[in-house]
């Protein structure tokens, strides 16, 4: 029986042989009769004439499946083989073989099998785009980043009771994280641009995870040890954003840039939600040290996955397909790692200063809301501490949702032909003017529910910044994306430190309306600077 009669209803592969293959042609043609592990048999319809053509090993590789041929009986002649019966077993499903003509005199020609329209050739997880594997790994690292950061805000309550810390001491402990965090913003960008994002981000996660695990031990040793460990944790987390930005600038094409960054940054928001939700449960059941031990241990699991699947750039990934490489690179060649940072050139560009100033204005309002929100809910809206804690989760959830919506909108606008400059200005204007509007309404609302809604809408519109200034570093200088983010985020962290302290000073002498007015003023300044000087064009090469 011919193989063509056994395998049907699927387009599986094709025969080629000397430019042509095998095809049934009635009595004057040839047909496929038998496949051996290392050979292909073509037979014409002349009596007892058959030819066996070997294709050592290559046939199986190009066929791309498991074929187990079996021959029940073969009668051998001096120059031919007569097939009484043959079978081929395909271990997945039946398939057709595309056939062609063999123009040789005896009905035979050298033939091989080539891979055709294979379906389900590999598991779905192997077909998943490699660039989005990198995005998901960065997303999960940012999830861990904020889980490990916010757990102290919950654990500090039982810790301060156990060790009799004053409010001033608690404030010192909370601020010690930023000592280290500030140190590695620019350094993290330099290291990532020189040595690759994989090394730097992997180092950062291991470093801050170890510091998280060491926190209970340091607290028992004494306050100075705890301050050092918290500063060390800040050092590790400080490299995360520059290293991530460096990697995505190499892995993600511009048409997917906004949504990929939005997804990664939403990991931070969801990390805060997860940390705020699970920390009280762990503390109640196992004690406050359990929060640090459990959250910190998750970093080791992430690091193993990072070592296995992450690469600093597409050219380092041996499993990256040529098709995906073309999508990522868009016809351009991958650049060599940065050896010298052109600081004078970078700092001479107005769009760079637009990034720095806008990042400062953005983070002033964001840090104030996220730091002082529980106090506002408790003192002004008269929610109890439990209610305040639950309501603090709402803005983080809102930001996670709207960051991804904004990313999708931005990439859609780019794909439809709107310039990157206009897209970045539109998205960041929403990220500035939205919070400014909703914060200005807080003095006019009459109910706590409306106040909570205004706060949530403020943070939701703020999340559009992920497709504005947070995506712009890769636009204007992809080779220096890590350094650029380190520069602007340093300004952002300083805004958080000074803004948080200034809010306390304002509240001692004024009101919450004054706090919100300062934030609104900075949002408006940021809008003006951004729209005057920002660009989406590459200015650093």
Curated annotation (Swiss-Prot):
UniProt induction comment: Expressed with a circadian rhythm showing a peak during the middle of the day (under long day conditions). Up-regulated by light.
Activity regulation details: Insensitive to dehydroascorbate, p-isoascorbate, inorganic phosphate, glutamate, ATP, p-aminohippuric acid or tetraethylammonium.
Domain of life where this protein originates: Eukaryota
PROSITE patterns: MFS
Gene Ontology BP term (one): xanthophyll cycle
Cellular compartments per GO CC: chloroplast; chloroplast envelope; chloroplast inner membrane; plastid
GO MF annotation terms: L-ascorbic acid transmembrane transporter activity; phosphate transmembrane transporter activity
Key words of the record: Chloroplast, Membrane, Plastid, Plastid inner membrane, Transit peptide, Transmembrane, Transmembrane helix
Cell compartments where the protein resides: Plastid, Chloroplast inner membrane
Disruption phenotype: No visible phenotype, but decreased reduced ascorbate content in leaves and decreased xanthophyll cycle for heat dissipation of excessive energy in photosynthesis.
Pfam families assigned to the protein according to its UniProt record, in alphabetical order: MFS_1 (PF07690)
Membrane topology designation: Multi-pass membrane protein
Tissue note: Expressed in stems, developing siliques, leaf mesophyll cells and sepals of mature flowers. Not detected in roots. Detected in palisade tissue rather than spongy tissue from the leaves.
InterPro entries, sorted: MFS, MFS_dom, MFS_Na/Anion_cotransporter, MFS_trans_sf, SLC17A9-like
Transit peptide: 1-28
TM stretches of this protein: 133-155, 170-190, 199-219, 221-241, 263-283, 286-306, 352-372, 390-410, 430-450, 481-501, 515-535
PANTHER family: ASCORBATE TRANSPORTER, CHLOROPLASTIC, SOLUTE CARRIER FAMILY 17
Protein family (similarity comment): Belongs to the major facilitator superfamily. Sodium/anion cotransporter (TC 2.A.1.14) family.
Protein function: Inorganic phosphate and probable anion transporter. Ascorbate transporter bridging the chloroplast envelope. Transports ascorbate from the cytosol into the chloroplast. Requires chloride ions and the presence of an electrochemical potential across the membrane for activity.
Name of the protein: Ascorbate transporter, chloroplastic
UniProt source species: Arabidopsis thaliana (Mouse-ear cress)
Biological classification of the source: Eukaryota, Viridiplantae, Streptophyta, Embryophyta, Tracheophyta
